[in-house]
């Protein structure tokens, strides 16, 4: 139930379905967004994205993007963050300093158009999540996607329908981690 895999291509299509960039009216797009995320809950959450693509005559395209997510500063004695290590008396382990959790991803995709109505893409994504000195996770994930845009000229002049499919986040982690990438279709 992720409708964004079938939306029209744009600067941020690398994050949803890079093949859709082949059907954009533009040969080049770039975009930047910043959102002070969840500011009604607690200040300090930042979400930024930078993305774009370059299409070679709507037959091949290269897409790129990076996302940056930062949480508020955490102190070792914060009660609302149970993952901070505690000793047997439930006190924060000495030596842990305040930190600000950070997640960064960098995406690079190649897309190829097959015929007039179908495009395919493959995306590689490097992901790094850091929780100060506590732990850091690094992963490499891949997406494979298809995007189809079919005109409905016989019924409605100038109208079209689009469909998309994607297998995302299959890959591996680099670190000794108990976490796996959440592969989904």
Over which residues does each language-model region extend?
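Subset of outer-membrane beta-barrel
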Residues: 1-185
């Amino acid at each position: 139930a992720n409708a964004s895999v079938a939306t029209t291509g744009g600067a941020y299509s690398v994050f949803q379905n890079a093949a859709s960039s082949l059907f954009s009216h533009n040969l080049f797009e770039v975009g930047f967004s910043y959102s002070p995320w969840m500011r009604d809950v607690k200040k300090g959450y930042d979400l930024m994205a930078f993305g774009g693509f370059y299409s070679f005559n709507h037959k091949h395209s290269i897409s790129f993007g990076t996302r940056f997510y930062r949480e508020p500063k955490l102190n070792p004695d914060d009660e609302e963050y149970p993952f901070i290590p505690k000793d047997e008396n439930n006190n924060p382990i000495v030596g842990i300093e305040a930190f600000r959790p950070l997640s960064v991803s960098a995406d690079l995709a190649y897309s190829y158009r097959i015929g007039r109505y179908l495009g395919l893409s493959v995306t590689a994504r490097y992901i790094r999540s850091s929780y100060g000195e506590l732990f850091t996770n690094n992963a490499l994930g891949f997406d494979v996607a298809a995007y189809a845009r079919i005109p409905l000229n016989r019924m409605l002049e100038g109208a079209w329908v689009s469909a998309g499919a994607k297998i995302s986040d299959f890959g591996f982690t680099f670190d000794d981690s108990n976490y796996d990438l959440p592969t989904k279709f």
